[in-house]
Each structure stands twice: as C-alpha cells, then as structure tokens.
Amino acid sequence: NDPCEEVCLQHTGNVKACEEACQ
C-alpha cells in the first residue's frame, strides 16, 4: 500500500481525500 496514504489515513481517516492528496 502507498505509504503516503497510510500516513494520511492515520491522520484523517478519509480514504477519498488521501487518494486525491497522494496521487
């Protein structure tokens, strides 16, 4: 899994936002 998304989810829990931010 993408480490960016992993970290993002730990902070926000928002999968959609993390996918957008990390693409």
Curated annotation (Swiss-Prot):
Top-level taxon in the UniProt lineage: Eukaryota
Disulfide-bond pairs as recorded: 4-22, 8-18
Keyword Manganese: no
Main location: secreted
Compartments, as annotated in UniProt: Secreted
This protein's UniProt keywords: Disulfide bond, Ion channel impairing toxin, Neurotoxin, Potassium channel impairing toxin, Secreted, Toxin, Voltage-gated potassium channel impairing toxin
Gene Ontology CC, one term: extracellular region
Protein's UniProt keywords contain RNA-binding: no
GO molecular-function terms, A-Z: potassium channel regulator activity; toxin activity
Tissues and organs where the protein is expressed, per its UniProt entry: Expressed by the venom gland.
Domain notes: Has the structural arrangement of two alpha-helices stabilized by disulfide bonds (CSalpha/alpha 2(S-S)).
Recorded family membership: Belongs to the short scorpion toxin superfamily. Potassium channel inhibitor kappa-KTx family. Kappa-KTx 2 subfamily.
Function: Decreases the amplitude of the potassium current of the rat channels Kv1.1/KCNA1 by 33% and Kv1.2/KCNA2 by 8% as well as human Kv1.3/KCNA3 by 70%.
Name listed for the protein in its UniProt record: Potassium channel toxin kappa-KTx 2.3
Organism: Opisthacanthus madagascariensis
